[in-house]
């Protein structure tokens, strides 16, 4: 990108385009700007979906030793009110990769990023459970209230009729998600769409926990989802979008995602007048 400007939505932002047009890179450069600093009380918390509220460089970027050089990258994020523009540049570091992204002109520890909880859901979430060598399960991660809400959201979004008897948190080398069991099948037989949805719902619940536990410190958050529509039925993609908008409004989230789905893009377009009415 050279001299490009774009605006993100107050609640939802969809990024679409041909393959190889740096959609995931856009997600990366936005979320890379944010972290939770050492002195932030929310830093000790861990998301239900695994990882942390500090989106990892390795989940977003694989730099080229040929084309990615120090001082070869720069971008600026502007805010609606109360904050100055924040410019990030690439600087040299020892190790591999030999480039890191940091606030332009700043070198002190803690100056490099803005403190704001962020979750980045990469395509690693789509690794099939069947391909994981070791899995740890836990039936106690969610509260009863969260479990009831999860069951309702799962069946609403997937347009499913079979009652869920239990939900099990699944942790492996590559991801942490949640699977469902019914009288007809258990979590071992869940589809990839169910697995993908479970991870996204856990991310939403994670922000809700921050919102409820830290009412004074929590000001909102950022959720980025790469290829959100992957593995999901088109009608379920639309139902998911409605749920995301509801949670974004309730929890002051900015949710950004990449997609190739025409159904999802049409649904986003239909939401625009609704959003203006909401504002």
Residue ranges, per PLM feature:
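P-loop NTPase switch/coupling surface
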Residues: 1-129, 139-146
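Extended helical coiled-coil dimerization/tether regions that scaffold
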Residues: 119-218
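Walker B catalytic acidic pair
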Residues: 226-227
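Loop/turn-to-beta-strand initiation segments
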Residues: 252-254
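H-loop/switch region of ABC-family ATPase nucleotide-binding domains
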Residues: 258-260
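Conserved H-loop
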Residues: 262-266
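Conserved small/polar residues in nucleotide/adenosyl-binding loops
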Residues: 277-278
């Amino acid at each position: 990108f050279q001299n490009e400007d774009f605006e993100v939505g107050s609640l939802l932002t969809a990024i679409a385009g041909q393959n190889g047009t740096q959609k995931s890179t856009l997600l990366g450069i936005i979320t890379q700007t944010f972290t939770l600093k050492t002195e932030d009380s929310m830093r000790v918390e861990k998301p239900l979906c695994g990882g942390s509220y500090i989106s990892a460089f390795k989940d977003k970027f694989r730099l080229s030793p040929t084309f990615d050089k120090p001082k070869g990258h720069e971008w600026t994020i502007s805010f609606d009110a109360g904050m100055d523009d924040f410019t990030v540049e690439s600087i040299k570091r020892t190790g591999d990769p030999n480039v890191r992204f940091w606030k332009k002109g700043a070198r002190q520890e803690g100056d490099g990023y803005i403190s704001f909880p962020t979750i980045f859901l990469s395509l690693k979430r789509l690794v099939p459970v069947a391909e994981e060598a070791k899995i740890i399960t836990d039936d106690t991660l969610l509260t009863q209230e969260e479990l009831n809400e999860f069951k309702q959201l799962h069946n609403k979004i997937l347009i499913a009729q079979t009652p869920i008897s239990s939900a099990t948190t699944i942790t492996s080398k590559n991801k942490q998600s949640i699977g469902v069991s019914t009288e007809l099948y258990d979590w071992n037989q869940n589809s990839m769409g169910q697995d993908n949805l479970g991870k996204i719902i856990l991310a939403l619940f994670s922000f809700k926990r921050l919102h409820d536990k830290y009412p004074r410190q929590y000001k909102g958050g950022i959720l980025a989802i790469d290829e959100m529509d992957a593995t999901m039925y088109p009608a379920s993609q639309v139902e998911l979008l409605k749920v995301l908008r509801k949670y974004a409004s309730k929890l002051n989230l900015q949710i950004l995602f990449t997609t190739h789905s025409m159904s999802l893009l049409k649904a986003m377009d239909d939401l625009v007048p609704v959003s203006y009415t909401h504002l």
